[in-house]
Structures are given as structure tokens and as C-alpha cells.
């Protein structure tokens, strides 16, 4: 009986949400989140870019992801040389190569887009998820930590996150990253890195930078 009551309650809540979607918002919450984040980042002088969903194996190798890398088994391959992107970073590196030659520094860009991984770490992971990646490149090295914290605060505030933590964590791609965690349940909301970084060499990039990737569904 208790289960039936709970089920009835949850069904009622979901129907109310659907009715609210139709009568009030008329846009999915994730879409509204994207708009809020896009608007605030543009206001803060970041430029939105859009890159392809299909990624070449060559670009993955530039991220040190080869056939022996742990992430390889999580990739959705379309053929032997192309896959659905597991991350936004490779194409953003490619875009930054050109922008650094054309624009005055610092160069500030961001992208919001779908990424795909065969995740195997429980119910909190999905094969398709929406990432926000923002990068500021060409700033002074001594300002990196401060700027990273400013960007983390900007995004979390826009997303309505009232309590979060920043801590160091190991990464299969970057070696070590700085994670942004929900202050209540320690769920990872985003992951940040700073350069110069060893991965920069493959893209002929030498500038100091900060970058953060957020999972929008988690925000």
C-alpha cells in the first residue's frame, strides 16, 4: 500500500510538471538552462562556437587517447577513423589554433553540445550528455587560479547552484584536474584544467590557459 501511495504521488507530480511545461515554460528545463548560461557567458565577453559532433581518430590521438587508453572502450565508433565525440576539447583546441593567430589575447570561447560515451559507472551516467566547455587562453600564468575560480562561480551562480566545492582529482586525459562538486552530495558538476599542459604541444599551443567542462544535466 505504501508503494502504491508513493507511486500515485510521483505520477501526480510528473503530470503537474508536464502541465507546467505546456502552460508556463513551453521549453524543456535543459533548454532554458542552456539559454541562461549562454546569455551570461556572452555578457562576460566569451564567444560561443559550434563544432562538429563527429570526431576523427587523429584528433583523439592528439589528446593522448590511443587504442590502449581506458577511454577508448567507451567511444562510439562510426568506422575505424571516426567516432561520436566523447568530449568537446579536441575541436576546441583546433578552433583555438586559428583564433590565437587572429584575435588579441586573451581569447575566450565556449561551446555547449552533446557528447557520447559508453559509460559503466552506474545510474548517474548516461551514454549521451550535454557539455558546456569554456576556455580562456592567453592570460598571465599567475592569474590562472583566480580566473578559474571566477569562471566556476559565474557558471554555478547562473545555474542556480548555491553551494559547491573545488578540489583536485586525477584524470585519464589531463593527468590532474580541478573538480567542481556539489556541496551537498559531492556530485561532480564540472572538471577544470590549466595550461600550459603537455597536451598543448600536439596543437602547437604555448599560451597559459584555464578551461572548465560542466555537465548540464547535472547542473
PLM feature spans:
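TRNA-recognition modules of translation machinery and tRNA-sensing kinases, especially anticodon-binding
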Residues: 1-219
Amino acid at each position: 500500500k505504501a508503494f502504491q501511495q508513493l507511486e500515485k504521488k510521483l505520477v501526480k507530480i510528473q503530470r503537474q510538471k508536464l502541465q507546467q511545461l505546456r502552460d508556463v515554460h513551453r521549453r524543456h528545463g535543459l533548454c532554458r538552462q542552456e539559454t541562461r548560461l549562454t546569455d551570461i557567458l556572452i555578457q562576460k565577453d566569451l564567444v560561443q562556437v559550434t563544432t562538429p559532433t563527429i570526431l576523427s581518430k587523429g584528433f583523439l590521438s592528439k589528446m593522448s587517447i590511443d587504442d590502449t587508453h581506458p577511454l577508448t572502450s567507451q567511444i562510439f565508433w562510426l568506422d575505424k577513423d571516426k567516432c561520436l565525440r566523447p568530449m568537446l576539447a579536441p575541436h576546441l583546441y583546433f578552433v583555438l589554433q586559428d583564433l590565437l593567430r587572429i584575435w588579441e589575447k586573451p581569447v575566450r570561447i565556449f561551446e555547449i553540445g552533446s557528447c557520447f560515451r559508453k559509460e559503466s559507472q552506474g545510474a548517474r551516467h548516461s551514454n549521451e550528455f550535454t557539455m558546456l566547455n569554456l576556455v580562456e587562453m592567453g592570460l598571465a600564468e599567475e592569474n590562472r587560479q583566480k580566473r578559474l575560480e571566477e569562471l566556476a562561480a559565474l557558471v554555478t551562480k547562473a545555474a542556480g547552484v548555491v553551494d559547491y566545492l573545488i578540489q583536485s582529482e586525477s584524470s585519464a586525459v589531463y593527468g590532474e584536474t580541478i573538480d567542481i562538486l556539489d556541496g551537498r552530495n559531492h556530485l561532480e558538476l564540472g572538471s577544470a584544467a590549466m595550461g600550459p599542459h603537455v597536451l598543448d604541444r600536439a596543437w602547437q599551443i604555448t599560451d597559459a590557459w584555464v578551461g572548465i567542462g560542466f555537465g548540464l544535466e547535472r547542473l
